[in-house]
Amino acid sequence: IVDTVLDHLLKIMDFLACNLDSEGGTGCLRALYGDWNDSINELGGTRDPGKLFGSGVSVMATLHFYQNCKEMAAILKKIGLHKEKAAGYSRYRRQIEAGLFQYAIDRNAAQERRVVHGWGDKLSYKIGSWRDPDNRARISSTSHAFWVLSGMIHTDVTMRESILKAFEQLDSKYGL
């Protein structure tokens, strides 16, 4: 059997959709083995016996999937195929939006906002937050960048100031 490019893309989307966090209730994409950023490689793990992965999430990967849902729905509409899948991708986007707004935006005591890089199993800790597991505040450039690149910024334009402030804090003589 030879798959088309479209078949391949649909299989990827199905795989990602099957890995949205339903158990933890965040609706975001579980980290599994991690993403390219070594700082979150353990986010997908769990201490639960018999389970390979937990409910830890990569915000960057979630935002990739969020963007892919929009793009795939547009492709399917354009070619007039898989209307049910296109509708599903729109539902996933709404689910992801709700989850990201509830869990990915971290606030400090002054109510300043930051987009975290991710969180561990059962929201046990966050990375790129105002208070990481080592009690240090960190800023993740990738989660903030993908908040903009994925179009998530259009769902709440007030995040613009928070994102600009995060990048200003990351700016140094060595770059971001």
Where would I find each of the regions flagged by the language model?
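Aromatic- and histidine-enriched alpha-helix N-cap/loop-to-helix transition segments
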Residues: 4-7, 53-67, 138-142
